Amino acid sequence: MELGNQPGPGNRPEIELEWYQYVQNTVGWALASYGWYILFGCIILYFLIQKLSANFTRAGASTHTTVTDPDEIVRRQEAVTAARMRMQEELNAQAELYKQKQVQLQEEKRRRNIETWDRMQEGKSSKVACRLGQDASPSTSASSSPSTSSSAPKPKPERKPLRGSGYNPLTGDGGSTCAWRPGRRGPSSGGUG
C-alpha cells in the first residue's frame, strides 16, 4: 500500500487552492467586465426596495385608520346626506318656479286666444291683435282696452335698400364678381329633384 497514490489529507489543500484560484479568476473576470453594471444595479435595487416598502407601509396604515374610526364614517355619511337634502330642496324650488312660469305662460296664451276670438267675432283682423299681443308685455296688454288695440299699426321705418336700383342679376350688372350662368340641362345628379 502506497500512500502517495491515494488522496489523503495532504492533497486536500492543493484542491482547495485550485478551487480558490478558479473562483477568483471567474469572479475577477466578471467584476472586471461587468463591475459598473453590477454596482449600479445594486444601487437601483436598493432604492427600489426602500421606495416600495415605504409605499406598502403607508398603504397599510391608511387602510387601518379608515376602518378603525367609526365616528368619522358617521360624520361623513351625515354630511353627504345633508348635502343631498340641500341639493334636493334647491331642485324642488327651481321646479316650483318653472311650474309657476309655465302656468303664467299658459294664462297669457289663453288670454291672447280669447282676445283673438273676440276680435274675429267683431269682424276685426286677428293678425293685428296677434302682433299687438306678442309685442306688448303682459302688464301693458292686460291694461289695454279694445279701443286702443283697434288703432292703426305703427308705420315701418324707412330702410335703405340693400342693392342699388340698377341691380339685375341676369345681366351681370351690380358690381358682383361673378355673373349669372344658366343651369345645366338634364336631370340633377342625385338628391331629391
From Swiss-Prot:
Topology with respect to the bilayer: Single-pass membrane protein
Origin: domain of life: Eukaryota
Record Pfam families: Selenoprotein_S
Chain segments carrying region Disordered: 114-193
Basic and acidic residues composition bias: residue spans: 114-125
Keyword Transmembrane helix: yes
Comp. bias intervals (Low complexity): 137-153
Gene Ontology cellular component list: Derlin-1 retrotranslocation complex; Derlin-1-VIMP complex
Annotated family: Belongs to the selenoprotein S family.
Name of this protein: Selenoprotein S A
